[in-house]
Regions:
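Short beta-strand/loop motif that positions the catalytic acidic residue
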Residues: 295-297
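Alpha/beta-hydrolase active-site loop
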Residues: 131-152
Length: 361
């Protein structure tokens, strides 16, 4: 009798896991990650906003006890988070991430004659990278929520955490404005400091788009919004040294065509929308004021701009009405704290935060 019950439960769980294949998305074959029964799955859905294909990846433990949804940063892709996702899956977290629009495999081929050109010179950039589509920033946030609803439907009742890194940290805070009731905890990683020049930057991008095309790429825009972070590390003579103190990580990033590319003007317009919306005082519904929120950043991250900027970001959420906001700064670490040599300290802190918040529920 007990064996029959177990068989029925196992069959029901299997059907639940497989149902997304039929109703919501297209999966690739499972890939076994570790002997403990951890599996990796890829899926593709169409964005409910404009049909943009979104490719996602799940790392699933044998017995999930919570969900962690991850929003990656600018000019990178979901596979870079596999080591962290495996670490969390080994501790019972079902981890899900998708390539944001205009990143990784979530892109349409460019449609403009000026696409993928920088000042008239053709770049070796995979078509569609860095192009978000019309209303890209807002749609990116809604894409995140679409994934949330799919996962909650397939794995109902599990505590649900979200983490965003860099541009993703802007996206998850924009998500918070409307969808905070979906979450049981939020981790804000590699937070960009508030930039008072963002409105001026938006005006510049709009002017460039009138002169050129939303698909076009601009060295001027890239220099203003991205390359400036390398200035404190010029002595290291390594492009993108600002992202990590481990040069092996940086060199791998530089060789990855899905990372080392120039945003389109449309991409920068979408990024600046996320920045403005994140730090805007308007539009916050705050339906879950007791939501635990943890900021984690590297002390040497030039994108953050120092401890003062981090405290400003923390205060911003507290003033919007969130009561349980905390932070951790990691000495000697730069922007990508999940890839630093001391990354397991960060992994541990995130896992501990999530576990403690589950126990408080």
């Amino acid at each position: 009798m007990n064996q029959k019950r177990c068989t029925k439960k196992w069959t029901a769980a299997k059907r639940r896991r497989q149902s997304m294949t039929v109703s919501e998305s297209r999966y690739r074959a499972d890939k076994t990650e570790r002997p403990g029964g951890i599996r990796r799955k890829y899926f593709v859905i169409a964005s409910a906003q404009d049909g943009m294909p979104l490719e996602g990846m799940m790392v699933i433990p044998s017995r999930p006890r919570a969900v962690l949804q991850i929003a990656h940063g600018m000019c990178e892709h979901k596979e870079r988070y596999l080591p962290f996702m495996r670490y969390m899956a080994e501790r019972g977290y079902l981890c899900v991430i998708h390539d944001h629009r205009g990143h990784g495999a979530s892109r349409r081929e460019a449609v403009s004659a000026d696409a993928d050109k920088v000042l008239g010179k053709k770049q070796d950039i995979p078509a569609g990278l860095g192009y978000f589509g019309k209303d890209g920033g807002r749609f990116l946030v809604r894409d995140l929520h679409q994934i949330t609803r799919i996962i909650k439907k397939q794995y109902p009742g599990l505590p649900y955490f979200m983490m965003g890194h860099s541009m993703g940290s802007l996206a998850v805070r924009c998500y918070l404005k409307k969808y905070d009731r979906e979450l049981d905890g939020l981790i804000v990683c590699g937070c960009p400091g508030k930039n008072p020049m963002a409105p001026l930057g938006s005006a510049l991008i709009q002017m460039l788009q009138k002169m050129k095309d939303p698909h076009s790429r601009s060295i001027l825009a890239d220099g203003i919004f991205a390359n400036m972070f390398d200035r404190p590390f010029r002595a290291e003579k390594l492009i993108h040294a600002w992202i990590c103190s481990d040069h092996t990580v940086v060199e791998k990033y530089n060789k990855d065509p899905l990372c080392n590319f120039t945003f389109t003007l449309n991409g920068y317009e979408s990024l600046l929308w996320l920045m403005r919306s994140t730090y805007d005082r308007k539009g916050w519904e705050v339906r879950n004021p007791n939501l635990p929120i943890l900021f984690v950043s590297g002390e040497d991250d030039p994108c953050l701009g120092g401890r003062k900027k981090l405290l400003q970001a923390v205060r911003h959420l507290k003033r919007r009405g969130y009561d349980r906001v905390s932070f951790r700064l990691y000495p000697g670490m730069r922007h990508e704290i999940l890839n630093e040599k001391g990354r397991f300290r960060v992994y541990h802190d995130i896992a501990y935060f999530s576990r403690v918040k589950q126990e408080d529920m």
